[in-house]
Amino acid sequence: MERKLRAYSIIKTLFVLIALATAGCHREVAMPPLPLRNITLSDKFFDVWPTSPTRAFIVGDRGKVLLTEDGGRTFKRIDIGTQLGVFGIQMTDDQNGYLCGQDGLVMRTRDGGKTWKRLDSRTHLFIFGLSFPDTNHGYLVGDRALVMSTTDGGESFIKRQLQRLFPPEISDYALPYEEPVLYSASFVDVDHGWVVGELGRIWATENGGKSWQEQQQSLLPQWKRPLGPNDDARFADFLLPTFFSVSFRDQKHGAACGLEGWVIQTDDGGKTWNFAHQADKPGAPLDTLVPGAVQIPARDPLFSIDLFGGDQGMSTGLTGTVLRLQPNGAWAHDPSVPAVPFPLSQVRFFDATHGWIVGYGTILYTEDGGKTWRYCQG
């Protein structure tokens, strides 16, 4: 009997404690919901395109498109009607623009980005980059050596593959080399453009994509990585690093960047390309340039490059890497950019003064040419 009374007492005490914990001394007040934020650490932003010193579009994963009109102090989210990843965006003027992305996604706006219409790209391949020299003419690149072009603002597309064909007896072995992924395009007008991608591919056209020429051959004598015991000499020119981004300021001057932190440059339209020196900081001694040598410590991949303002340039990459073009043609780590431990996917300047850097959970804005940067919280 005593044991039952003790058990009853314990149960009663527990109920009292639960009641007190639930009710407390005051009436419970409903907490307001947390505000919805346009920028979170889980966001993956892939590209940015400014249309004025303070107005810019930013695109990313899960169909996310943001617009700021006040230099990143506030953002408006634009519903584009898809959850597909958006990898690239370009506005050709204040009203007209295009974006591209996952599963053949191509969309167009004609009202300044308020609404977006999906275009029939006739492909389900990923489209990683685009370049529109004007509102009607554009070029898009992607998986399996895909290049698409339009001359009517996306009403129709011409598709082709920039592939290298090998003899039938080695076609199975050569399959990964025949259709490399193309990541980036840069056109300075409707005729002259460049495309870069996997395995060091560089292609150029001077007639609006009617024909293309490979340009990476000038890099091969500079590349000092020897063939391995199982490497086939017929694939020697595929040992170059993958290039993720290319930027041309005119028909002569361009740069590209990619794996292992390499930057290449040309001042003759790509007839010759050269690997660029790098430095730990502005004014520091340059590295010993041995392209292809194993880097210790390893250098971060570079995902984007932008030539702007006549003679300036920046490049961004993994774990917050930011390089700045120096007067001597070398690239140095830029200490003015806040340390960010996340990938920085894209740098883009509107002019020599106003620019943006976007990446994973990160949007940065400068209005003094990159001397200082401001985090945009949205």
List the predicted regions and their residue ranges.
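Bacterial N-terminal signal peptides that target proteins for export
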Residues: 2-14
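Bacterial N-terminal signal peptides
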Residues: 12-22
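Residue-level hotspots at or immediately adjacent to binding/recognition sites across diverse folds
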Residues: 25-378
